[in-house]
Structure formats: C-alpha cells, structure tokens
A protein has these predicted regions:
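C-terminal membrane-exit region of the final transmembrane helix in multipass inner-membrane proteins
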Residues: 362-413
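Short helix-loop junctions at transmembrane helix boundaries
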Residues: 327-374
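Mechanotransmission and gating elements of multispan inner-membrane complexes involved in transport
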Residues: 169-266
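Hydrophobic secondary-structure segments that place a key small or acidic residue at a functional site
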Residues: 98-100, 111-118, 132-203
C-alpha cells in the first residue's frame, strides 16, 4: 500500500503531463470501445436478421439438397423428423418448409421471388417475419401469400390483390396458381423485402407437386453460443436418416467471410491505436525517470534495491494505464450506450449496405464484456512493455550516476554550439529548438517514431480503403455492368420483359 501511495504521489508531481497522458489513453480506449461495439453491432445485426428472418439457426435437409437445390431431393413427412429434432436438447423450436423459386406476375408487372411454404403455427417460433408486417395480416390457410414492401411496390399490389405464380414443380412440370396477397412486411433489408415471399405450407406443397414432403426443417436453438454443439447432437440423432444438418455458418459462408473481414479491419485499427497509446505512455515515464534521477539516486544511497526502483516505475505505469483505461471505459461506454439506444442512421448509404447481407439502414452498436476485458489487459500490457526500458535504466545506475544523470545530459546539450549572429533570428530559434530536442534524444526518437508510425498507418488504411472500393468499382464495371447502361425507365427496379427498348 505504501508503494501504491508513493506511485500516486509521483504522478501528481507533474499533473499537467499526467493529465495529458491520461487523456490520450482515455480517448484511445474510448475510441476502441466504440469501434469494436460498432463492428460487433454490424456483425450481430447481419447474423440476427438473416437467421431471424430467413434461415433460422440450423436446417435439416435431405443429403445433397443444399448443394444441388433440386426439388426432388426431399424429406418425407412420415419420417417424423420434425418431432425428433424438437426433442434434442438445446433446440428451442422447429418448423417444416417447402422452399423454391417462382415468377410472380400481376397484369403487366412481374418479378422473380424466393417462395417459402411455411407452417403458420410453428414458423413464428423460428423466425420473426410475422412481426414485420406493416399492412394486412399474417398467413392463415388456403392460397394466401405474404410479400415484402419492395416486391409489393414493384408488382403494384396491396392486401386483397391477387398474384399469379408460375413455378417448375418437383416432377418437372410447370405449376401455376392464383394467390391472394394478405400482408406486406418490411424488414429494412432490400434482398428480403424485394425477393422473399411466404405462403402456407399446404399451398406450397400443392403448387410444387410436393404432397407429403418438404425440403427442409428449420430450427431455433436456445443458446446461440452452443450452436455447433447442438448441430452435432442433431446430426448424431439423425445419422441413420441420410440427412445433413447445417448451422447458419455453413448455410451462409459469405456472411461468415464478411464478419471475418470486419474483424480484420478492426484489429488493424486497434493495433494502430495501441501503438500511439504506448508512445504516449513511454514518453511520460521516460521524462519522469529522467527528471527524478536525483530522487532515485538518494533512494539507492539509502539502501533501496534497484529492483524496487524498477518495481516503482512499473507500478506508476500500471496506475497510469489503469486510470486511463477506466476513464476511456466511461467515455466509450457513454458514447456506445447512447448509440445503442438511438442507433446510427446509415439509410443514406442503403444502396451500398445492400452488399452486406442482413444489414439494415440503422446500426445499433453492441457491447460484449469480453471485449472490454481484452482492451484492459492489452492496454496495461502495452504500457508495461513500453515502460520496461525506462524502468530498467532507472534501476541499473549506481547512486552517483543516477544523481548526476540529468546534469550530465544538460552539460552534453550545452556543448552543442553553433556560431550564430544576432541578425539570424530564425537560426537562433532553430538552435533553441534543436537543443530542446536533443535534451532527451530518446524521448524525441520515440515521439518521432510514434508520429511516423501514425502517419504511415493512416496512409495504409486510406490506401487500403481506396484500393478496396476501387477494386469493387472495376470488377463491377469490367465484368458485369460496364460504365454506362441505357434501359427503359423502371427496368432496373422491376426487371420486367415489358420494360424493354423498342427495336
């Protein structure tokens, strides 16, 4: 406790320098907390929306269906797989489905849709599309269909209107039927609002000639962190049934890669911030050691072991980093808490966000406790590593060398001399500046290195982002769209054959 009081007292000797260092650490930590929460919020939203609106946490298919998507690779109702999966520990809910594609049309409007035939009683326990209805109601029975707000706009339909769906049935024939639009949903995700539709399971089985069968069983797990364990348990339970059990990472590998990419960008930025924070801490500790050379010399002359001097310097560093971390935590949690409640509105960039599956126009940062622990451990560790050299220098000198260290440095600087006349005031100021720099060359080198690293990191991140977006533009224009397209008005939205340019 006495050493801790001494460490706090030493930090109060130069309060301005300590305050500046604390502020730099706090701003760095606060920025890291918010950045990590922001990226975690993006990733969590993509995962929650895609699993919550479409896939569920896991699916059971007949083996081969996921790769080939052929309708004749189906599960039979008589196998009672839904009941078996529901009985597995860790599974919260299950629902059978028939999924396929259809061409929906009304008068002169048409659009391709991904159709999901669902059990209206069990589907809401696995997904939440029923809670996103903005007009009309959810499915009940008969030839009813639920469409997204973008699809409804493209097809010009509202609840009460009819759509004609044309499909290729499981037996290879062409199936068609009329369906009443009973509801319109809005998730804020273009690829769902524009291209996903639901109908009652029996209606889908009739449309696709799928009586007594379904393409998949979707399930919701009780604990998302135990998904792999539950997938393995379900797979073992059904190992004799020639089925495959896939969790959402296997169902949506592009989403997994997108999450990994976001994490990689976060780690790069975090590394840059940590280096800058370390430079600020080592600067403070180095100056403290230099200015207190006489104090350390007296302590060693009175019998204090050099190891205790090193311990004192490292303790001061730990206190400095710890206080900076706590202040940064308060700052970061305050900012993150505000935006977690109110969200960050990126609706102006909704077109760009369409490239990230499941991401809507408003992002809500999420805080994970383990991230805060990691930041705290790394901040203190980086600070101790940065202070190791100054601490070792403070403890390795003899009492006489320690007491004369500062005077020796000052005398060495005074020997640096330039013959400058009074008419060259600019050179006089340059001489004074150089003397200040060379007064502590090690500190100056650390500061210059930190500045150079920060600039290099900024240029790298800027070039990385610039190259990333430039590559996206080039790949899209060279391989697909070209630089300019001429089309009938509205064709880019509806993709209707009727919206064509006359010969």
């Amino acid at each position: 406790m006495a050493w801790l009081r001494l460490a706090f007292g030493n930090l109060r000797v130069n309060r301005r320098r300590t305050a500046i260092t604390l502020l730099s650490v706090a701003v760095g930590v606060g920025g890291l907390v918010f950045l990590w929460a922001f990226i975690d919020g993006i990733n969590a939203q993509m995962i929650n929306n895609m699993t919550g609106y479409v896939t569920g946490d896991l699916k059971v298919h007949q083996r081969g269906f996921h790769d080939d998507r052929e309708m004749n690779i189906a599960l039979a109702e008589r196998w009672n797989l839904t009941e078996e999966v529901s009985a597995v520990a860790g599974v919260a809910a299950t629902t059978p489905r028939v999924t396929g594609h259809a061409l929906a049309s009304r008068e002169d409007q048409s659009r391709a849709l991904q159709v999901m035939g669902v059990d209206s009683a069990t589907e809401p326990r696995v997904t939440r599309l029923d809670r996103s209805i903005v007009r009309g109601r959810y499915l009940e029975r008969g030839n009813e269909i639920l469409v997204g707000v973008d699809a409804a706009g493209a097809l010009d339909v509202s609840p009460g209107d009819e759509l004609v769906l044309v499909v290729q049935a499981s037996d290879g024939s062409i199936g068609a039927d009329r369906f009443e639009v009973v509801g319109v949903f809005e998730t804020g995700i273009k690829r769902i609002d524009g291209f996903v539709a639901q109908m009652p399971l029996a209606a889908a089985q009739s449309l696709y000639a799928f009586q007594g069968r379904f393409t998949e069983i979707a399930a919701r797990v009780q604990d998302a962190d135990r998904l792999d364990e539950v997938v393995g348990t379900v797979g073992n339970q059904l190992r004799d049934r020639n089925v495959e059990v896939l969790g959402w990472p296997a169902l949506m590998p592009s989403l997994v890669q997108m999450v990994a990419f976001h994490d990689a960008v976060a780690y790069i930025v975090i590394f840059v911030v940590f280096v800058v924070v370390a430079a600020g801490i080592v600067n403070t500790i180095l100056m403290s050691v230099l200015e207190r050379g006489r104090e350390f010399g007296v302590m060693m002359a009175l019998g204090t072991p050099s190891s205790r001097i090193v311990w004192l310097v490292l303790l001061e560093t730990t206190v400095l980093a710890g206080l900076g971390y706590l202040l940064g935590l308060v700052l970061g949690l305050s900012v993150t808490g505000y935006f977690s409640s109110n969200g960050l509105d990126f609706s102006a960039y909704i077109k760009a966000m369409d490239t990230m599956p499941g991401l809507s126009g408003i992002v809500y940062p999420t805080i994970e406790a383990q991230r805060l622990v990691v930041i705290g451990i790394v901040v203190v560790s980086v600070a101790l590593l940065a202070a190791a050299l100054p601490a070792w220098n403070a403890g390795r000198n003899s009492p006489l060398e320690a007491m004369g260290a500062r005077r020796t440095m000052i005398n060495r600087i005074r020997r640096i001399h330039w013959q400058v006349t009074s008419d060259h005031r600019l050179l006089i100021f340059a001489q004074m500046a150089l003397r200040s720099v060379f007064r502590n060359p090690r500190r100056s080198m650390i500061t210059a290195s930190a500045t150079a690293f920060g600039l290099a990191a900024y240029l790298f991140l800027y070039a990385f982002a610039d190259g990333f977006f430039e590559q996206m533009i080039q790949n899209s224009t060279q391989q697909l769209s070209g630089h300019v397209q001429v089309m009938a008005k509205g064709h880019d939205v509806d993709l209707s054959p009727d919206l064509r340019i006359a010969d």
